[in-house]
């Protein structure tokens, strides 16, 4: 549904929400809604990641009768207070207060958490296997989201892994990403610590990094750890000047930073998981690496040593990003979903 059609039908609706993933919400806040975010002490707007839009309003509590729908956030860490107490309790408490409007929940994760979920499954009487851990997570997510209007996920594979969900693939606006002259550098940007080694592909990352340095003399720059970006401009400048971007993730659904790298004209080397092979064509607009650090390191090294080819692939990747991860399409997908939810609620 396009913006003009939605506004003619519903006018400027009011949405209740709260901070979660700043970069994702920066795009959501481009939707033609009146946004109200809850002030609390668990999640705050990340000014380093994105500037806060001026039209965003802040409220101290939820006021029944004031809003048209609520947009809340969850991920696999929220399935138990023992995993992430703050996020878990924030979701439960806020969700429990909202009874007069439909709730849409964005599930930002997948049930890939073998460090924790098999043990949780064992506590519930199952064998402590990774498969049972996924089953446990599916059930707990269904319990947590019972009664919500829709659960939105970030990849088609996430729908399969959770067993349900409405996929909306993220979208960006090409004008906001800087495709600059490239320096012969490889970078990555994944979570540096905490639970989630398989989810983020940290072992593949670290092993690839070691091989690159020892075998090829190449430094893999870890954004957020090796390179601190003071603000979004600094990040876009550094990413836009990087020749190669490496994405090692396994469970992360459609990693946003990989898409940002594609918009920035980087030559992307990525694992195939969560649908990357739907849009990356080997040697044309990027590279799909095996879950093998020797293979990923070789692909990266080949691109660092073949600057011209890497730039050409990066340009094809940018064309793909503009087509597949289009911001206008992202917003239209959201307007279509919100229209459906509001229509269904109106008929109750």
In which residue ranges do the predicted regions lie?
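Conserved acidic donor-binding segment of nucleotide-sugar-dependent glycosyltransferases
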Residues: 280-283, 287-293, 302-307
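Conserved catalytic-core segment of nucleotide-activated headgroup transferases in glycan assembly
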Residues: 37, 164, 171-232
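A charged, aromatic-enriched C-terminal amphipathic alpha-helix characteristic of glycosyltransferases
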Residues: 291, 305-345
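N-terminal pre-catalytic "stem/leader" segment of glycosyltransferase-like enzymes
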Residues: 1-83, 289, 348
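Membrane-proximal helix-turn-helix segments that form the acceptor-binding/catalytic region
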Residues: 60, 64, 88-94, 111-150, ...
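Short alpha-helical segment that forms part of, or immediately flanks, the ligand-binding pocket
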Residues: 236, 258-263, 277-278, 284
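Aromatic "clamp/platform" in nucleotide-sugar-dependent glycosyltransferases that forms part
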Residues: 249-250
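Short hydrophobic beta-strand element within catalytic cores of glycosyltransferases
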Residues: 267-270
